[in-house]
């Protein structure tokens, strides 16, 4: 059984809701997770958030799902710009590691735009000297504001499947222009982690990247992976066969459970932190709602 608790943190930009999933047979491992939605959509109830968290909790992993602030969904609508969401995801990670909800190790991860935020938050922690995640789990990430052209093999697969061919350069340009409130060409490595250099990525923690198969966005993920390798990062890249972008948000597809299992296996392979020597409870700077079993 999994116990789910909704909490509101005093985040860097105001109230920050998070939802924590705790297994009744916890392993001690933890993951802070960010859903996707093009930076402007998505919530804690979507399969890419709730379904992923429940699936990982079934493996004994404690999951903190972050309800970060969104960019405007339409012109004139309310919303925030970069770097608000990235900073909130990083804050949630730091909070989780000191919350006492799991012994650790703690990982950070996300899907699509959420994977961008997880990668960005990790880069910020690396640069500022904050505690780093033991693993960065990126599912079909978007990591470049200016979308590179796919190779001939991927281009042919996209041309053969118009439903999958929906993240071309114009779409990605508009998505990042909305996130930034400006020209995507001016994006920095916090907004587009794929821009980070090998020098900037030195010391980056291990990465598991699970890409969708017929997905133009995987080009940016593969380029980021190449840079991480040159920087000396331990990185594993998997392409989930037969999938389109966002397969974690379609739990009816068998690949969703397969990908969740990959993340669980990689995280569970990490040694659990020893029990603390002090019985003191860590600070928990949040207002908690009553837990409910699910």
Protein language model regions, located:
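Alpha/beta-hydrolase superfamily serine-hydrolase fold, recognizing
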Residues: 3-294
